[in-house]
Every structure is written in structure tokens, then in C-alpha cells.
Design a protein with these regions (language model features):
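A cross-family phosphate/adenosyl-ligand binding-site feature
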Residues: 1-122, 128-329, 333-403
Length: 403
């Protein structure tokens, strides 16, 4: 999943020959999961049609302040368009448009929207070589970047004039990659690694049977997504689960038993800044695992159990600068048990949820949690979707590590 997935991108197209490439650019942004709206300058329609772009973006294309629909005139509100966008991208950005952006020459819908936009603005210059290196253009580029806009540099290559040099608009894939990398670098967990555990563990009795629990792994998977969306590289150690994950920053490590999860966590722990152990790890396992399937011949079956390794406590003993978060799923004395676990296992925070709360716990799409830090300060959240709960948890962690 791309970092622009779910984001609203306003694409401004100006009158340059590179405008034909915006069809591919729109397709790439849509494929990355973004929602795209397009504003065209009137002259850019000579290079690519609004019909093409509206078909690809699945949204109407805007180009003038007013549009006629039968007998009615509709106003394209440039303020609303600017507020709608999470990011604005102007590509190609001609010398004419760069000058207007620099000086605030508000003579078309695109410039009016640019001047109203509250979001980050990217622009990809495109023009002939001599125009690109002219002092007027160089000044415009410098001033626009000084305003806080992000320039996607033009590249070296054959230009429409037949000359070879700088001024060629970056290729659509390079534009998308530039935006993705820039957005990632601005995120609060960019450059940090996070360890997350999810799902149950299965402790074998024989080749067929095992001791397990009802955990689906949904909560842990949602936390992994939330951490990745904050810029982290995530190591997701997952027990048996049907949950799927599609994010370039999430490395999934599949395990089955508590022992395998223990080893995987210890292998990654020294590299991470944050560890969130949400997995429902089995507390006990059969002392002896049979190599053949047990036959049903006796009225009872006795299985001797032994404790599994306590992953959370073991990491609490060796942690240095890591921020370590545990989970407490309780059925009675919830708060007391969670506080005891917080202290005994040397955690920085614990997330408490109770099976008594309707809609919380295993195999549901919702959860209700209380975040408790090492000073026992509590933040209780209402019942929410697990994706929303994951964001709440990550936001609380960010507050603590930034404090």
C-alpha cells in the first residue's frame, strides 16, 4: 500500500506539451489508492482533453470559475477545492504558471486554488532549455521553494524543440515516487523501526491437535498499519491468522508457537525503537508433544502442561531505549491486573481491554481500550473500530516518546 493511499490529491495541469503525460500520472495516483481531482488551465485543453482526465480520475475536471449546466451557472469554489486536498500537485508547471504562482497573478482557477490551498504543494517544472535556465525562471523556482512549495526537478533529455538539456518534466512514476518519499520523510516515525506481535499461538499436542485461543490478529494488524502510516518500518510477528497486510513498510514474519514468537521477537528487538506486543500468546504448552495422532480410546485424556516463555517480561528485562507496550485482556479485576503487569514486566505502557465490554476482544471489528502509561495515567477510549483504536494507541505512544 502506498503512503498516498486514501489521500486526496488535487492535480493542476498547465499548457505545456508534457501535459499529455498527465493521463499516466492520474492512473498511477489512482492505482496507488489516492483520490484525484483535476484542475486545468483553459489552454492546457489543447494538449489533453478533460474527457480523458475525468474518465481516468472518475471526477469532473475543473477549468473555469463558472460552468454552465443546462440553464444554470455553477461556481467552482476555489477555496473549497483547496481545502479538499491533502496535497496539491502542479504538473506540468510552465514558465508562465511559475511566474503567476510567484507573483500571485490570480487570473485562472488553478492559480486561485493554489493561493487558497492550505495543503503541501508540489510542482514539476516543464519547459524548453533556455526558458528553464533563464534568470526569471530561476528566480521563480527559488522563490516558490522559499514559500515552502516542493519542487520536483526537471530532468535532462530531448525537449519538444529538438534541443537536448534540462527542462523535461519528470516522468510520472518519478513524480509519484518523489511525493511518496517526501511525505514519508515528514512523518513522525520516519526512520524508526517498530516491532508488533499479533494473533494467537498454537501449541502442538500431536500432529493434528493444538492448544490455542480465539484471537484473530485483527488488532495487531491494524496497529501495524497505523505504525507504517506514520512512517515506521514495521516488523509484524504474526501467529496463525487469516488477516492480510499490503504495505511496503510492513515486513511480516509468520510463526506458529510461543517459542517461535519468542525467538522472532528477540531477533528484532535490538533494532527497534518501539515494541507493541498485542499477540495472545499461549501461557502453557504440552510438556511432551506426541509424534503420532492420539486415538480416542479412553474416557479421559491427561496432558501435562508447562509454562511458555514470557516474551513480554523477557523483553522488559533487556530493554534499553525501546518503548515497550503490552496488552492485558482481562475478565476480572481488570485494572488491578493490568497495573500489576505494567510494573512486573517493566513496561512503558499497557493497553487494557476487557472481554466484559460488548464489542471488544477477539474476532470482532471493534474494540474498547484504556491506555495506561508507566506513571499509571489512564486514557480511556470509547468503543471504536479496531483501525480507529490502532490510531488512538499510536497517538498515545507518540505523545510519550515525544515528551
Amino acid at each position: 500500500m502506498s503512503i498516498v493511499s486514501g489521500k486526496k490529491i488535487l492535480l493542476g495541469i498547465t499548457a505545456g506539451i508534457a501535459a499529455y503525460k498527465t493521463a499516466s500520472l492520474v492512473r498511477l495516483l489512482i492505482k496507488s489508492g489516492a483520490e484525484v481531482q483535476v484542475i486545468m488551465t483553459p489552454a492546457s485543453k489543447d494538449f489533453i482533453t478533460p474527457l480523458t482526465l475525468s474518465t481516468l480520475s472518475k471526477n469532473p475536471v475543473h477549468s473555469t470559475f463558472y460552468e454552465k449546466e443546462e440553464e444554470n451557472e455553477l461556481w467552482n469554489n476555489h477555496v473549497d477545492l483547496g481545502l479538499w486536498a491533502d496535497y496539491m500537485l502542479i504538473a506540468p508547471a510552465t514558465a508562465n504558471t511559475l511566474s503567476k504562482m510567484t507573483n500571485g497573478t490570480c487570473d485562472n482557477l488553478l492559480i486561485a486554488t493554489y493561493l487558497s490551498a492550505k495543503c503541501p504543494v508540489y510542482f514539476a517544472p516543464a519547459m524548453d532549455l533556455d526558458m528553464y535556465i533563464h534568470p526569471s525562471t530561476v528566480t521563480s523556482l527559488e522563490r516558490l521553494q522559499a514559500f515552502g512549495n516542493k519542487m520536483i526537478p526537471a530532468t535532462h533529455g530531448e525537449l519538444a524543440s529538438g534541443l537536448v538539456g534540462e527542462g523535461r518534466m519528470a516522468e510520472p512514476q518519478d513524480i509519484v515516487s518523489f511525493m511518496e518519499n517526501d511525505i514519508m520523510s515528514s512523518l513522525p516515525l520516519y526512520g524508526k523501526k517498530v516491532l508488533i506481535t499479533a494473533g494467537p499461538t498454537y501449541e502442538a499436542i500431536d500432529p493434528v491437535r493444538f492448544i490455542g485461543n480465539h484471537s484473530s490478529g485483527k488488532m495487531g494488524f491494524e496497529i501495524a498499519k497505523a505504525a507504517a502510516n506514520l512512517g515506521a518500518k514495521v516488523f509484524l510477528v504474526a501467529g496463525p491468522s487469516n488477516e492480510k497486510v499490503d504495505h511496503a513498510s510492513i515486513h511480516r514474519i509468520d510463526v506458529v508457537s510461543a517459542e517461535e514468537m519468542y525467538l522472532a521477537c528477540h531477533q528484532q528487538f535490538s533494532e527497534v525503537a518501539i515494541a507493541i506486543l498485542s499477540a495472545a500468546v499461549a501461557d502453557y504448552r504440552p510438556k511432551n508433544v506426541l509424534t503420532e495422532k492420539i486415538k480416542k480410546k479412553d474416557a479421559t485424556l491427561d496432558i501435562e502442561l508447562e509454562p511458555t516463555k514470557d516474551i513480554l517480561a523477557s523483553l522488559g528485562r533487556i530493554k534499553k531505549e525501546q518503548f515497550l507496550v503490552g496488552f492485558a485482556l482481562e475478565t476480572n479485576n481488570e485494572l488491578a491486573n493490568a497495573l500489576a503487569k505494567l510494573e512486573q514486566k517493566n513496561l512503558d505502557a499497557i493497553v487494557l481491554n476487557s472481554l466484559k465490554d460488548k464489542g471488544a476482544g477477539f474476532a470482532t471489528d471493534t474494540n474498547k481500550v484504556t491506555f495506561i502509561d508507566k506513571d499509571t495515567h489512564q486514557v480511556a477510549f470509547e468503543l471504536k473500530s479496531k483501525s480507529e483504536v490502532a490510531i488512538d494507541i499510536m497517538n498515545e505512544i507518540l505523545k510519550k516518546i515525544d515528551a
